[in-house]
A protein has these predicted regions:
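Carbohydrate-recognition beta-sandwich/jelly-roll modules
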Residues: 1-180, 198-206, 218, 271
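Aromatic- and carboxylate-enriched substrate-binding clefts and catalytic-loop regions
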Residues: 11-15, 26-27, 172-409, 414-417, ...
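Short linear, low-complexity motifs centered on an aromatic residue
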Residues: 132-134, 161, 169, 418-435, ...
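Aromatic- and carboxylate-lined catalytic core of secreted/periplasmic carbohydrate-active enzymes
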Residues: 312, 400-412, 417-446, 539-559
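Carbohydrate-binding surface patches
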Residues: 403-411, 448-500, 504, 543-553, ...
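Solvent-exposed beta-hairpin/edge-strand motifs
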Residues: 492-511, 600-624
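C-terminal beta-strand-rich structural cap/linker in extracellular carbohydrate-active enzymes
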Residues: 518-574, 593-597, 625-671
Length: 671
């Protein structure tokens, strides 16, 4: 229960419950809650509590009932945690635990709660590092639902093999550096998504060369449900149930994924995506919710095989309990946080809260494939076979920025000849290595609690260097302008941070301009934006996107890399030190890559009424011959940049100008 002047929010299938005492029949929101969602309750001051299962995630849940001792006060309730009624039996000596974590700040409390579950998982799992996963660390091309080539669309080609080979060639000729390609389910023998796949053998009409490395690229591969009539039924142990569209199953034999992943990695698989997770539990089958072992055994076997073969996992269409259980699955680095990006519905609106929830549990939130074309440019012949067959994308800047800043997979999905290279290169180096933020995109605390912004979709990603934070802020469907202050960005995570910052609007294809100074006493305003009305037939922007940077001790501001979503990506800048005399940066890049670093040397004049911030651009080019190599065989060089108010910024390949010791752990994270 809460006081009437305090708001209450919670995660419930991406639903915000609102104020506890103002939700009619509020108990109906919770009764029968069988999806395993954690409950986040908070007041307007940010005092928060998270309650969830701490074990047996597949078969546990919550319920609520009114407190009959006080029938007139609908703000009182009795909350229950326990096992689901879907269980048909419980073993002797069975134990179940729940956990309650309380703290100050919504982001901070969720992270503390996630730390607890990761520890209780007993597998030593840490939060994902975006540069420890080949797929997350590199630009890719995707063919799943919403992609141009979904369902094997290949107008003008004899088959999909020919289409993808030509696509690869065309992107190479355009210097668009994709490093892997995702195959969805359209190439394999199946009986549809449900009841599922029959085999992992390609249909000859799609891939004449069969299951082989004919493409010559690393692959992200996929499985929907598994049909109970698949070719492996007599070779491995399965749990099978009947659904209206036929029998469906999950493998319980540890050898199944060992053999499947051995085959996949033989042709270049670097990631395996398990889709339709929601259908295995509360959805069509109940395969994982009728006993206490099946779900655990199924995903544990998948994880052990992934570890054995050095690949990572993506969960797709998960319920909340799959995400909680992912704290025990070492190989899962990301999970889908939206519906399929078919441009038909506003599924991207869930990215803020899900980004926060997912990362608290150790994984990154994925928002699916993206198109890069300009507004209303039709991609003729696309494979979007959903009802409205939308073959255009008018929200590309929002989709692409969110996909990159969330730290989930960034997979372009345009048809050949449609890809906007300018937009794509906001994401990565010239060799296709991604430039990501250290902290992924997530809802900010004040969007839950503060009366002037409550309910606003305001998300931010961050890069931190010591006490200095650079933020990338996105507002979606804002009905009013939202005030932003330095403390609203820091959220108590950094002590001694600068209280004066600058901000500018991010506009694709344009350099940094229109820089404004803001502070605690003089906030900047995130402008209001239009709703995501479909089919996006509106002239005004559906989102607002600001970048923000601190004023450093010498009065300068390093705005960061021009024309990148993460202007100060920790994948580019491995060291920054700021003193009252100078700012020193160590940066890494691909051979012969040129970067543009925007900075301001005159912010100390900010109190002058006539002050107009001046932006300077420093252009640096990395050597053509680099000698260092990262874990993915990417060559890279280092450049040092020194900035002083009087002389501006200058770059050098000479290590002698670097007076700062490199932090080993930061260097290791990107290499």
């Amino acid at each position: 229960t809460t006081k009437k002047d305090h708001s209450v929010g919670l995660f419930l299938s991406n639903t915000r419950a609102g104020e506890w005492d103002q939700v009619p029949n509020y108990h109906e929101l919770f009764t029968g809650d069988t999806y395993g969602q954690p409950w986040l309750l908070h007041n307007s001051h940010g005092r928060s509590a998270v309650w969830s299962s701490a074990s047996n995630y597949f078969v546990s849940g919550f319920a609520v009932e009114p407190d009959n001792g006080d029938d007139d006060d609908k703000s009182h309730a009795i909350l229950h945690a326990g096992l689901r009624t879907t269980l048909t039996s419980i073993p002797a000596d069975f134990r179940h635990t729940s956990v309650l974590v309380a703290g100050n700040g919504i982001n901070a409390t969720l992270m503390e709660w996630g730390d607890v579950l990761l520890h209780l998982g007993g597998r030593g799992k840490k939060r994902a590092n975006v540069y420890d996963d080949f797929m997350l660390a590199h630009l890719g091309y995707w063919t799943d639902n919403g992609a141009y080539h979904y369902r094997g669309a290949h107008d003008g080609y004899q088959n999909m093999e020919e289409a993808l080979l030509d696509l690869k060639k065309g992107l190479e000729e355009s210097n668009i550096p994709i490093r892997y390609l995702q195959w969805d389910d359209w190439w394999m023998e199946s009986k549809g998504d449900i009841p599922g796949m029959l085999s992992w053998e390609p249909k000859p009409d799609d891939f004449p060369s069969g299951f082989s490395d004919w493409l010559g690229l690393p692959l992200a591969m996929y499985a929907p449900e598994y049909s109970g009539e698949n070719v492996w039924m007599h070779d491995y142990d399965w749990k099978v149930v009947k659904v209206p569209r036929g029998p469906t199953a999950i493998p319980l034999d540890p050898n199944f994924y060992m053999d499947l992943f051995r085959n996949g990695t033989s042709i270049g698989m670097i990631m395996f995506e398990q889709d339709f997770l929601c259908s295995y539990g509360i959805g069509d089958s109940g395969l994982t919710t009728t006993d206490v072992d099946s779900g655990y055994q199924w995903l544990r076997n998948m994880d052990e095989a992934a570890i054995q073969f050095g690949i990572t996992l993506q969960f797709c269409m998960p319920d909340a309990y799959h995400l909680l259980h992912s704290t025990q699955i070492v190989s899962v680095t990301n999970a889908r946080a939206t519906g399929d990006n078919t441009r038909e519905w506003r599924s991207i609106l869930s990215m803020g809260q899900n980004g926060l929830l997912f990362y608290a549990l150790g994984v990154y939130a994925s928002c699916d494939n993206v198109w890069t074309t300009n507004a209303h440019e039709e991609q003729v012949g696309c494979g979007n076979f959903n009802q409205s067959r939308l073959c255009y994308e008018t929200n590309a800047p929002l989709d692409n920025a969110v996909a990159v800043l969330s730290n989930g997979p960034y997979g372009i999905a345009d048809g050949l000849g449609y890809t906007n290279k300018t937009l794509v290169m906001y994401s990565c180096r010239t060799d296709g290595k991604m430039l990501r933020p250290r902290w992924p995109l997530a809802s900010l605390d004040f969007s839950f609690t503060m009366s002037d912004t409550k309910g606003s979709l305001v998300w931010a990603a961050h890069d931190d260097f010591g006490p200095y934070r650079w933020s990338y802020v996105i507002g979606v469907e804002l009905s009013n302008s939202v005030p932003i202050t330095p403390s609203r960005l820091v959220q108590g995570a950094i002590h001694g941070y600068p209280t004066t910052m600058v901000t500018w609007e991010v506009q694709v294809g344009k350099p940094v301009s229109g820089v404004m100074v803001f502070s605690e006493s003089s906030p900047c305003l995130l402008p209001k934006s239009r709703p995501l009305d479909l089919p996006y037939d509106i002239p005004a922007s559906s989102h607002t996107h600001l970048a923000m940077a601190p004023v450093l001790p010498n009065g300068m501001v390093i705005l960061g890399e021009n024309r990148k979503w993460a202007t100060m990506s920790f994948g580019r800048i491995v060291q920054l030190e700021a003193t009252e005399y100078a700012v020193t940066l160590e940066i890494v890049g691909a051979p012969f890559e040129t970067i543009e670093l925007a900075y301001m040397a005159n912010v100390s004049m900010q109190h002058d009424p006539a002050f107009t911030p001046l932006v300077d651009i420093l252009t640096c080019t990395f050597p053509s011959s680099c000698t260092e190599i990262d874990k993915y065989a990417n060559l890279y060089c280092r450049i040092w940049i020194v900035c002083q108010p009087t002389y501006g910024c200058d770059c050098s390949n000479d290590v002698a100008i670097n007076s700062v010791r490199l932090i080993p752990e930061v260097n290791a994270m990107i290499n």
